[in-house]
Amino acid sequence: SRGLGDVYKRQLMSDYDREMFNLELERKLHFLRWARMIRISALKRNGLNHLMKAVDEAHAAAYRKIPTPKLTRALFEAVERQQPPRARGGRPKPRFAHQGGSNPPVIVIHGNALEDIGESYRRYLEGFFREKFDLAGTPLRIEFRTKENPFVKDDNKR
């Protein structure tokens, strides 16, 4: 599955080495914070129920369908909490959101001047949607679509 990883023979490590290994793993895999870390032991035969539950949750999150009105309300809530930063004299204006696919879930946000939204705000929205709709254990893609202004003259379209 996309949201699961494993480490073998952890029980052979000392407590100190195991703790240092966990810290190093979290540091190096910071970009996978959305993935659950399940600790199992084949030797002690524990953790498998947690692992299977995590697999089921990741699968359910990857295929979850989220209605457009709920996504749009969540988008407005996210923007109300934290406005997109100004760029080029204006502020990007997200208008609505819909689900553009599943496995992994894709949330498509439509609006004006969205090409000016930076990576940090994209990560903020990803975290907000992930928490709001319980999308743990699966990657989440955010796409921005800006409608062209029909009143802006483009010399190339003559």
Predicted regions and their residues:
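Short, non-transmembrane amphipathic alpha-helical segments
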Residues: 25, 121-135
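Residues at or immediately flanking beta-strands
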Residues: 91-93, 139-143
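Long, well-ordered amphipathic alpha-helical subdomains in the mid-to-C-terminal portions
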Residues: 52-59, 65-117, 122-125
